[in-house]
Amino acid sequence: MTIIAGVDVGNATTEVAFLDGTRLLGVDRVPTRGRKGSVDSLRGAAALVRRLERRLGCRVTQARVAPLRAVDTTTLAIPATPPATGRLRLITAGVATPGGTGAWAGVPLWLDRPLPPAGEPGHGGPPGAAPAVAMVPAGFGHARAAERLRALLAGGVPVGAALAGGDEGVLIFNRLNATLPVIDQVDLAAVAGCDLVAVEVRPPGDPLTLLADPVALAAAFSLPAAEAGDAAVLCRTLVDFSNAVVGRAAPGGPDPGASRERSPGDAGRERSPGDSTPGDNGGPWVETATERVPLRPACALVPGWPVGAVRTLGTGDGPVEVDDLFALDLAEVADTATARRGRLGAAALVASLRRMPDGADHAAVLADLLGLPVHSMLSEPAAARLGALTTPGARPDAVVVDLGAGTVDVIAPDGEVVAAGAGDLLTAAVAETLRIPRAAADWVKRGPCLRVDGAQRFEAEDGSRGFLDRPAPAAAAGMLAAAGPAGLLPFDRQHSPAEWRAIRLRLKEAAFGANLRRALRTLGGSLPQVLLVGGPAGDDELLGVLLRSLPADVPVGRGSVGGTLDGPSAGHRYAAAVGLGLAGRGPAADLAGRGPAAGPAPEMER
């Protein structure tokens, strides 16, 4: 008995299939150790072969492995460049703990300073005094601030709002005997160069009425007609926010926008050392054969470029040569999904296919580890096609789409395209969107969620309600939760179930649908049938997304690898591993493509 092990080392998962002639004996998989193609990853593959040998009670005669190329999926936080708004400055928006409600515009009045002399802006008391917005520096103390505000209001000073540098907005508001908007966690240094400040707080979920209305804002700031366009641009960025602070720069004052101005989506978000800011000369970029493009605008261009168009990725660590690159702009996804602004962040996600190092002999390394002959007879895409065509009903001319963690491989009878960006890119997008670890995002991305209402009730994405099989932890109340490895996995409080569904599907379209269309355009040719294999192919939602991405008359189905071989089917996974096990075997390879609806397949290349 000659048993061949097909070994497929992926970016996230290592899969092994044992075949004895035309019989599929068994399959197994484990997470890939280290970087794909590294010695650690091959050690993990060898250990998996030995584990499957023990499980099946047999010994492998020889093994097959394809040449390996790794895909890097990175998250680059690139705050969106604030639009030009003239003298208007966006100070903050979307603060989590505001106090009170209302809208007010006035001159800054600093509580840690003496009142201005009579007749100057900010002096209160006499009728006609200028409206003021109180400034509470961090460390001033909420009790002291509230006492000072009560005294000012009692003295007739027209203070209609307060801004706090600390996080004591609610504490200050609760100690006032007046209803006025209080916003905390404000960068008061950004207010220093402003002669007028507008503050608005609305109930959670309600839109702004003053700061999102260009006409009202222009009137509040006494803007001339020439600056009406600046108000319109700024107000457009505040759609969907329920609180915000806007300033009017004083003539000749410092420019807060030069160093402090942030987009609404960055409000309250800490910057990491690698973040690029507007005006940075060292921001990430991509380079094709003809041009160099900054990464953020390139995100909108890459889906229209052919696979392999990007040759170099430049980051703070220096330029890196790549065979392909795919990028995803979360801010653009948010706009397309009509998500509330600021809820998806401003990161650009990049998946790049690194060039294979010269002289890499993965078969030799694996042979030393196993003590067996190991051959590289097929590329990964070719092996995946051979394995996928063992699906019952597969046509010999079918186009196989192997969806992996790092790449989307599209393989036709006469050509193949390997496009960077797949499951890991989606995981990174979900993790960045929800601010959760990637390990949790790997479960959250897979399908529908529910919102836990109390201990045992839930609300589903379609609005239906029901009872949980078992009580949820008290900490999960009010949270979205998805099926996890040990029951419900709570993951978010910021989105409704329906909103998260819309965002999740849009992320899948952006990460998989757009990339698949790019790969198919690069490959060219007709689509008589499309077979989906690989780990992500088990995502029922993703199947629907890809169906909508392709022409309506193209039959698209999920592979059932090994379905025409003897032995149990391996399902939608293990296509490359089974294909490697079949490589070079004429009688076994002839079974690829045979099924109830497919006639005999032509002889496979070997």
Regions found by a protein language model. Name each.
Residues 7, 12:
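Residues forming the flavin
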Residues 195-196, 414-444:
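Catalytic or ion-translocation cores adjacent to nucleophile or general acid/base/metal-coordination motifs
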Residues 1-6, 23, 30-397, 451-454, ...:
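Nucleotide/phosphate-binding catalytic cleft detector across ATP-hydrolyzing
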Residues 438-461:
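A short helix-loop
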Residues 389-416:
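Phosphate-binding/catalytic loop of phosphoryl-transfer enzymes
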Residues 402-404, 420-424, 510, 574-575:
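Conserved structured core elements
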Residues 411, 416, 423, 530-539:
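Conserved structured catalytic cores and adjacent interaction surfaces
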Residues 13-40, 415-425:
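Short glycine-rich, Thr/Ser-proximal phosphate-binding strand/loop in the N-terminal lobe
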